[in-house]
A protein has these predicted regions:
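Soluble non-cytosolic domains of exported or imported proteins
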Residues: 24, 40, 52-59, 124-131
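Active-site-adjacent betaalpha module
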Residues: 66-70, 91, 101, 112, ...
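Extracytoplasmic/secreted envelope proteins and their assembly/folding machinery
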Residues: 3, 43-46, 58-62, 66, ...
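Short, well-structured beta-strand/strand-turn elements
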Residues: 53-55, 68-82
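Bacterial peptidoglycan biogenesis and beta-lactam-recognition machinery
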Residues: 8-15, 66-75
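Low-complexity, Gly/Ser/Thr/Pro-rich intrinsically disordered linker/tail segments
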Residues: 111-133
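Short conserved micro-motifs at the rims of enzyme active sites and ligand-binding pockets
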Residues: 60, 108-113
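Gly/Ser/Thr-rich loop/hinge elements
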Residues: 1-45, 49, 53, 83-91, ...
């Protein structure tokens, strides 16, 4: 899990929970003590650039790191997508709908970034985010 690269190996941190509606099951996601690559750690600053097109898992990573007070978010409010979608057939028709089937629940805020997106710490247009950072 990418968030683990921006934490220390110990103590383990409860990063996120994902509620799967189809299974009626909540899975807790914790930081990982060992990683395949080099850990960035917590001693260096971390800035994440966002736009209105930042969507899905990218939003989850930004929201988790923001609420861990590990990253500063610079740019625009994100799209407010979802972590998992499923395509379902409507009755005996040729129509399908795509619906969210899982929900991210942050252990710090008790809330999700879905629908409303992730609000930046520094609100600037996406094209100005790198300069603002």
């Amino acid at each position: 899990y990418i968030v683990s690269y921006f934490t220390d190996p110990e103590p383990l941190i409860h990063i996120d929970s994902v509620y799967d509606r189809t299974a009626d099951l909540t899975i807790e996601l914790w930081s990982m003590p060992t990683l395949l690559g080099k850990r960035y750690g917590t001693s260096k600053p971390l800035i994440i650039l966002t736009s209105k097109d930042t969507l899905g898992i990218a939003e989850d990573v930004a929201y988790c790191l923001k609420n861990l007070k590990r990253a500063t978010i610079v740019g625009e409010n994100t799209a407010g997508g979802t972590v998992k979608m499923s395509k379902m057939k409507v009755g005996d028709t040729d129509f399908y709908v795509t619906v969210p089937v899982a929900k991210s629940i942050n252990p710090i805020t008790g809330k999700s970034w879905e629908i409303n997106g992730v609000a930046p710490d520094v609100d600037v247009a996406a094209e100005d985010a790198l300069d603002a950072a």
